Amino acid sequence: MYDKFKPEQAVGLMDFVRAAKSCIKEISPDELKAKLNAKEDFLLVDVRESSEFEHGRISGAHLVPRGIIEAAADTSYPKHYPPLSGARNQQIVVYCATSGRSAMAAAVLQMMGYKNVLNLAGGYTRWEIEGNPVVREAEY
């Protein structure tokens, strides 16, 4: 993804999001809901910040903020996150608030060798607006 930009070019956030979206696959809220209802085996990763996660999330999601995704996914890093770092060959669905951060996270995971990463189109915002179930309290 980064090879599309030359050092002399000034780039902004949306340039990175567009570049990421050009090389990843997305899943619609309806498709994700069907996967959840069918109890398919995949890892659901919320890349928002913890304060966003605490206000509401999709049931079963693992919180791995975008700012630490590379460290969490790298088994050679001492503080990696085993559910993510061990899912290299498993399907992973990532989401954020509107799908920008998660698009970049999906692209990075692919660059790190993850084989089957999907980004939730429209993110948590679209998921919630479309009336899909959310969790607003702790899950144990």
Predicted regions and their residues:
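Short, surface-exposed ligand- or partner-binding patches at beta-edge/loop junctions that are enriched
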Residues: 95
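Rhodanese-like catalytic fold shared by cysteine-dependent sulfurtransferases
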Residues: 1-42, 50-91, 100-140
